Amino acid sequence: MSYESPAPVRQSRPAGAHVLWRCMSYLRPYWPFVLGSYLLLLGNNGISLAIPQIIRSIVDQGIRGGDIGVIQWGVLILMGLTLLRGAFTFLSGRWTEVASQSVAYDLRNAIHAKLQSLSFSYHDQAETGQLLTRAVSDVDRVRFLTGRAFLRLVEVIVLIVGISISMLLMNLRLALLTLTIVPFLVYVALWFGNRYRPLARAAQEQLDDLTTRLEQNLRGARVVKAFAQEMAEIGRFDDQNIRLFDANVVASRTRALGLPLMRLLASAGTIFILLYGGQLVIGEQLTLGELVAFTTYVSQLLAPVRRLGMIVSAVALAMASGERVFEILDARGEVQDLPGAEPLGPIEGRLRFEHVSFAYFGRHRVLDDIDFEVQPGQVVALLGATGSGKSSVISLIPRFYDPTEGRILLDGQDIRHVTVNSLRSQIGIVLQDTTLFATTIRENIAFGRPGAGEEEIVSAAQDAAAHDFILEFPEGYETYVGERGVTLSGGQKQRIAIARAILKDPRILILDDATSSVDTETEALIQAALARLMEGRTSFVIAQRLSTLRQADMVLVLEQRRIAACGRRTAEHTAHDELLEISGLYAEIYYRQLRPQEEVVFR
């Protein structure tokens, strides 16, 4: 099976119209709120179109005609329509917000679910700061697009059309003269949107970089302080901040050019009416009420037209955010369930690497023709220099990655032909970098089995030599461990991670330097617990300690991407003893790195 590199976070961009349509499609489940909002919008616009006609009647029939009744009734109707318009505006805004917040809720859930499903290869290339910005800031801009921004855009369009028709029906020549500015306004708005959107996206990507820099700085705060690099980090952050500042200035420059131009064009309508309309009134070709109605229509038109530039810029910004959100949602994970993949049933634990080669992101190989077979219940120790491929071997077993060539068989079945979740449910893992979540010790231990009972959790902690130190905390198993477990020592975090693996009760166990950061006494406790845990389970251990190598049923020595030597336990000798006899590389590692451990123990 060939390997394809995953799509990076920044990839080809969808077309603008497609992005807009796709954003709006998220409103479909909430169509009652959307329909209600837009019906109220139409009602609101109808009221806006009626008000100038009522004012015309008050001026021509009431004031000019001397009919006080028309004035009184006209004022009452205007007051009623104003109150009704306020109610419509309130309800429309409320329903729009419900729908748009629901869209944001769905998008955040979709992004989070997608990130859970994407392969390690995607997360290896993506930057955390970028993903956080897209899941929060960009989703909020899409929310604004599907809510008030698009509603206001529709309102402007409906008002322009409605006012244009009303003005044309009143006086054709004056209306045509006034409305000549509309095509120019539309052109400027479209030009402005097309120019502003890529600039807005560039600014957002600079915000990604700034967020990533800040996130990395906060995550490595202890290292920064330990190496006295505060000023250097301040300088790096300032460089990113300057780039963001420059990108925002360029975008705002375009915005500053477009908005005044639109306001200038919109104000020209009032000038035309006063010049030409005044002459028509003097020539008795237009009533004073009609002129007042015209100026009222134009004033109604000017406000939304002036907002058109801001609306277009907001829509352009939101569409750029939509592109970035959909880049995540459209990303394809390299490791997926193949068509026809079936859940993995109970397994014995026989595992075979069959001429497996692997390369990260399709680049140079890190594993080359790895071939070995492990029987159920055996313990396999992997030994080799940094970069020899130990971590890559164990990463292929739970399908964190798929081989570039060859295949991995579990009980004779290609692991790519079973569902990923069912495969991983049979595997317990203790990674080198222990990850604990910002919650209680109990919930961290039960992470792999959320429904585990109290006795099971305590038993797992006891087997991992964690129970005693947990009880030393005032809140015991309810102790909050803080972000990434910062309130615990390295050894304590490792033992909780081991308890988590024990509670899962896997058939296959993977240990990545699981006891590398504990003292001798704690190591002895953990080694005894792991020996009990590994009984009857197929286990893979990246070995750094001689005791692990002596207990292993098989020892694989990796060098330059290949298996340089393999030792197996027999009735006559251990895998360790065999390798000392047949492998010069293993003997060199033993005398340089492993034998000193033995000497320390016997001192």
Which residue ranges define each predicted feature?
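Juxtamembrane helix-loop junctions of ABC transporter transmembrane domains
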Residues: 8-16, 39-40, 47-56, 60, ...
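Alpha-helical segments in transporter systems
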Residues: 21-24, 32-53, 57, 74, ...
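Short intracellular "coupling" helices and adjacent cytoplasmic loop segments at the cytosolic face
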Residues: 3-13, 65, 101, 109-133, ...
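An intracellular "coupling" helix at the cytosolic face of ABC transporter transmembrane type-1 domains
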Residues: 32, 117-121, 137-146, 150, ...
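ABC-type nucleotide-binding domain
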Residues: 337-338, 344-603
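Transmembrane helices of ABC transporter permease
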Residues: 29, 33-46, 151-202, 273-286, ...
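Helix-loop-helix
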Residues: 66-67, 166-180, 189, 250-323, ...
